[in-house]
Structure formats: C-alpha cells, structure tokens
Amino acid sequence: MELRLYDTATREKRPFVPLHRNNVRMYVCGPTVYDFAHIGNARPVIVFDVLFRLLRHLYGAEHVTYVRNITDVDDKINARAARDFPGLPLNEAIRNVTELTERQFHEDVDALGCLRPTIEPRATEHIAEMRDIIERLVAGGFAYVAEDHVLFSPAAMNAANKVLPRYGALANRSLDEMIAGARVDVAPYKKDATDFVLWKPSKPGEPSWPSPAGIAAEGRPGWHIECSAMSWKHLGETFDIHGGGIDLVFPHHENEVAQSCCAFHTARMANVWMHNGFLQVEGEKMSKSLGNFVTIREVLADWPGEVVRLNMLKTHYRSPIDWTLRGLEESAKAVDDWYRTAGDLREGRPADAVIEALRDDINTPLMVAVLHGLRNEAASGGVDDVARFVGSLRLLGFLAEDAAQWRARKQQASGVDAAKVEGLIAERTAARARKDFKESDRLRDELAAMGVVLKDGKGADGKPVTTWEMAR
C-alpha cells in the first residue's frame, strides 16, 4: 500500500508523493523555550517522530530531512527571564532561561524515545532570513511599515494574482469569520483588524536587531515570521510536510502560508499539512487553574518514557486523547510484557503489517493491535517470530534498553530490597525441591505482597529457574 496522509489544507487523506524522492523534507513547529514542556507538548514530538522513522524506513535515512525549530525570542521568555533572574541584565537572563529550558526539553524528549531532528535551528540564528522575507513582502505590496512596525496585509494577499492561495484557506475560514472568532489586536497603526505583525520595535533592554524596511529603530521579529524563515533556510520555498498541533492551524500556520507564498510567489508552502489533536487529562482540558497541568518531566518521574510513548500512540494522532492513570497502567503492563517476550534479542526486520498500518495515515491504534498479535506469535513461535516482533518495536522507538536494564530500573524504582527477594526465592526453590508446596505457596504469597511477580521456567540445562519482576 502507498503512504497516505491526511492533509489539513484539502481536508482529505491522499497519497503522499515527495517533491524529490531523494530529498524528503518535513518541518514541525518546536518549543518556545521558557518553561518545562507539558504532556500535551509531547504529543506532536512523538507523533512526528513516528512519521520521521517511517519516512526513513521507506526512503532511506540519508534521504529524509526533519527540521524542528527552537523559538528563543518571545515575550514569554522575556517575562520569565526578568522574573527568575532579576539581578542580571535582561539579555544575560534570557540566555540563562533559553539554554536551561532547551536542555530540559532535550532530556525529556530523549527519554520518550524520540530521535533528534536532522536540523534544530534557533530563531535568533535566522534574523537575516527573517529580514530578507520581510523586505520581499514590503516590496511586493503585501506588507507595510507603521510606527516602526512591519505588518502583513491579508487583504492585499487576497487581492493579488491567482497563483497565491487565499488567506484563510488552510483554516477554511473567511476573513470575516477570522475577525469574529479571534481576539484580534486592533492597534491604531493597523490598516485592518486582520493585519498581523512581522516585526516590532524592541523596548529598552529587550533583545533587538537592526530593523528591515528602512526602519531606524532596532526591533525584533513577530512569532509567525520565524518559522517561515527557518523552513526556507533549511528546506526551501516549498517542501513536503509541515506538522504541528491542531491549535496552530490558525493563526500561526495560516500566517506562515501567507508570508512564505507571498514572499516567494508560490501556490504552496508545504504539500501536506498535518495536525495532531488536543490532549485532555481524565476527561478535562488541561489547565493550571484546574490543577491538572502536568509537565513531561513530572510524568517521567513516575512512568518510563516508553510507557508514556505507547500511551500516546494508542490513540490516532488526529483524534483527541484522554490522558488517564488507567491508560498508563495498561501501557506499563504492555511494555513489561514486550520486554519479557523480546528477551535479549535487539535485532530484526519490522513486520510488513506494522508498516502497512503506518502507511494508512500513521494509524498507530492499528499498529498497536498488530504489535500485540506479533507478541503472541513471538511468545509461541521461533526465533524468526521474535526477531520480527523486536524489529517492529525497535523501528517504533521501543526496546531502548536491554531486558536486564529494564527489570533493574523497574526494581530500583519500586524501592524493593533485591537481596531479600533473591533470598526468599532461594527458600522457595528449596521448598519446591523437597515438595513442601505449602511453604512454597506461603513464600510466593509473601513475595506477591511485596509486589513481586514470579515466573517459573527452565534454564538451558533443563533445571528449574525462577525469574522475578515488580508488578505495576
């Protein structure tokens, strides 16, 4: 089956045909580095990591470029820097905040089993490209200067030639609908309520750079222009896939399309637009006011990254996901079982059925069902069945540790005394050898009360062997 992806722009699932088969290009909006990423931020990271892995499998790792940006210039960053480092000059405080937060983000997503993108550009390293695009937009009549701001005019875009897309087409809204449905800044320097900022003057002490379009005062970029500049620099005027959360469709992605298409006179910025659905916690929208706001780091303190990863992938990426304790517990049991079944094997080719599930618009619920079937085949089959199961899991970012490491980390997290457990198992083994099954059962119950699950089997020499792990 061919790869088919749902395109937000056309609102249909259609075959994916890369612009250049030997250079498949994908851009995904990354974090604004001012605070710990919350669990909802993990969803696009995991979803597009799976797509990245699939594209590498289909086209070859050397033929796929994945760009995910770092936004390191933003009002939220300025506010956090002033709050956390009041005794430092603002620029130095900002550097402390962005470097720390970026490092925390990388630690979190690494723990989730995500590959690093091919390129991870920072906004502040692409100011020249932003100014270049802004100059083109002003020269083309799509943007104008007012009170040291540069603003983009959607009305000018929609009045232009038919090569350009209509502003609002991605979000499937008219200009009137966008005005009515959004909190629009109607600053007096705007010609129209829908106009949005490309560049603005910096306040004293804020980060600033020489301004475009003949503006004497230094300033800084608006949010939307950053992604247009970084995607252009690293992927070109038009590329294959642009991804992000559903909340970014409007205004962020709509404005990216407007800036890029008008600057380069193209009909498309990206051939396919993909958006993941919202995340809610125990049936409610996640928010600090409800007390259910959870960071990735907080979740990882209680659950292994592979458990979090599986819990995300059990729901199709376009559907809303309900983040629940029960779901995490079920995912933990599944990952434990996968490690037991895989044993020490870490090589193998992925099953065709897994690839076919992913070819169908990254159908991860079907993929998970296939994995459970492969697990059953591996548990009762031969080494080829285990290898196919392992290869499938490895492709998807699972089995990052060997089985012994997984068990040891789980045991350590439980706080159980491993030496005591081993001693009780030895006593039970001796009781079984002398056929004292009452004592054997008593010891098993004692271990179960400690949260220890026993698995009786035979070693290579045919003698009885008992292994153990902690129950979740």
From Swiss-Prot:
Motif residue range(s): 'HIGH' region: 31-41
The reaction(s) this protein catalyses: tRNA(Cys) + L-cysteine + ATP = L-cysteinyl-tRNA(Cys) + AMP + diphosphate
UniProtKB keywords: Aminoacyl-tRNA synthetase, ATP-binding, Cytoplasm, Ligase, Metal-binding, Nucleotide-binding, Protein biosynthesis, Zinc
Motif residue range(s): 'KMSKS' region: 285-289
CDD domains with a match to the protein in the record: CysRS_core
GO biological process: cysteinyl-tRNA aminoacylation
Residues engaged in binding Zn(2+): C29, C227, H252, E256
Broad class of enzyme this protein falls into: ligase
GO CC entries: cytosol
Molecular function via GO: ATP binding; cysteine-tRNA ligase activity; zinc ion binding
E.C. no: 6.1.1.16
NCBIfam families with a match to the protein in the record: cysS
Subunit text: Monomer.
Protein name: Cysteine--tRNA ligase
Species of origin: Bradyrhizobium sp. (strain BTAi1 / ATCC BAA-1182)
Gene of this entry: cysS
